[in-house]
Amino acid sequence: MSGGTPYIGSKISLISKAEIRYEGILYTIDTENSTVALAKVRSFGTEDRPTDRPIPPRDEVFEYIIFRGSDIKDLTVCEPPKPQCSLPQDPAIVQSSLGSSSSSFQSVGSYGPFGRMPAYSQFSPSTLVGQQFGAVGVAGNSLTSFGTEASNSGTLSQSNAVGSAFTQDTRSVKPQLAQGRSSPQLDPLRKSPTMEQAVQTASAHLPAPAPVGRRSPVPARPLPPTSQKAIDNQEHRRAEVHKVPRPENEQLRNDKRQVVPGVPSAPRRGRGGHRGGRGRFGIRRDGPMKFEKDFDFESANAQFNKEEIDREFHNKLKLKEDKLEKQEKPVNGEDKGDSGVDTQNSEGNADEEDPLGPNCYYDKTKSFFDNISCDDNRERRPTWAEERRLNAETFGIPLRPNRGRGGYRGRGGLGFRGGRGRGSGRGGTFTAPRGFRAGFRGARGGREFADFEYRKTTAFGP
């Protein structure tokens, strides 16, 4: 093989010391490590050669196998390399590329996935040796077709010297031997000392594996390693996105709400505060309040002046009593003693006058009930004016009288006594007497409750 003949691309028949014959295309020859690489290799087994461990032939076609030179028993050239169809020496041609063909070897200028290696169009992907050796940038995965990779790459050039170009590229085989995954299909091949020593020798001279990148003829730039600090900062920023409010969006919303001068703005129904809030009021984003120490009740109570509070409370009670006395007048000639129950209650209150004064709000020896929640110490019937005022405060003032139906339901009084109801019927106004519960139709009140004392004012409508 030293006669200057370019054997690269020739079909080689190789017999190892284990009496196993291989056939493949000569890929590279590494003179430094004394290794030979064959592509598109097929194993024919030991055939009829005498050996202690016969191995049957295999139908698989391996992408490439690297053999140690000292373990090769015989090596013969079966077919010379096919002639290359090169373009004529035309100064107008700057760059050219050949498409994928069915030939066993392409142009020297067609680079494969290893940077400066020839591309083979007919190499079928095999998972056997590809998983054993792997390739730089693939990290253990099986190699794809060299012709496909070469056709996809855009930087292809033409070369004339076939032998010299591949002689310079023999050192580029070493990065191919990246450690990859093993396959059970390689068990018969591992028994061969040629294969084992070739793998050991190649792995011993392996440089540091390059970072994984795209399979292209252009050397991939190694990506800087991502530090843990950068990852933590990125996660922290993502967490702050959900916590920090967005003042810019709120400002834009406020700017959109500004009304143009001279144009009246239509009233809008807010959904819980503002229109863009989606039912949210002024939600505190600061989180729950944190108290540094317990609440001091003694210092808080010392800030209040109990005497002033009691004095203000008694003044309010006196004002209420004066107003109630002025409003208590007999209505329709009725005296307070119309009801025997009221007379009895008033007498009981007179007898049970509080001897301790107004400051004693609760005396458990005297009664179970207290005097705090009671506005008036005397049991009495609510007057018509007071009941009307309570009804107006509770239900509101009607805009106009309803014709044919009762106005509004009266407020219930104390104990079992009913409130006062007003109903407006057709053609008249009916006022229910005391003791009657409100809520009936005014038009029927005059007929159904004729036995009660009532005041009826007849008014003729339009």
From Swiss-Prot:
Modified residues (Asymmetric dimethylarginine): 400
GO molecular function (one): double-stranded RNA binding
Chief localisation class: cytoplasm
Location relative to the cell: Cytoplasm, P-body; Cytoplasm, Cytoskeleton, Spindle; Cytoplasm, Stress granule
Biased composition (Polar residues): 149-170, 194-203
GO cellular component labels: cytoplasm; cytoplasmic stress granule; cytosol; mitotic spindle; P-body; ribonucleoprotein complex
CDD domains cross-referenced by the UniProt entry: LSm14_N
Modified residues (Phosphothreonine): 194
Residue interval(s) of motif TFG box: 379-399
N-acetylserine modified-residue sites: 2
Biased composition (Gly residues): 409-428
Residues where Phosphoserine is found: 182-183, 192, 216, 227
PROSITE patterns for this protein: DFDF, FFD, SM, TFG
UniProt biased composition (Basic and acidic residues): 232-258, 321-339
Residue ranges occupied by any DFDF domain in the UniProt entry: 283-319
Disordered, as annotated region: 149-287, 321-358, 397-439
Compositional bias per record (Basic residues), positions renumbered to this chain: 268-282
Chain ranges for the short sequence motif FFD box as given in the UniProt record: 360-376
Record InterPro entries: DFDF (IPR025762), FDF_dom (IPR019050), FFD_box (IPR025761), Lsm14-like_N (IPR025609), LSM_dom_sf (IPR010920), Sm (IPR047575), TFG_box (IPR025768)
One example of a Gene Ontology biological process annotation: mitotic spindle assembly
Chain's role: Essential for formation of P-bodies, cytoplasmic structures that provide storage sites for translationally inactive mRNAs and protect them from degradation. Acts as a repressor of mRNA translation. May play a role in mitotic spindle assembly.
Family: Belongs to the LSM14 family.
This protein's domain notes: The LSM14 domain and the RGG repeats are required for accumulation in P-bodies, and the region containing the FDF motif is responsible for cytoplasmic retention.
Listed PANTHER family: PROTEIN LSM14 HOMOLOG A (PTHR13586:SF2), SCD6 PROTEIN-RELATED (PTHR13586)
Subunit (UniProt): Component of a ribonucleoprotein (RNP) complex. Interacts with DDX6. Interacts with EIF4ENIF1/4E-T; promoting EIF4ENIF1/4E-T localization to P-bodies. Interacts (via FFD box) with EDC4.
Protein name: Protein LSM14 homolog A
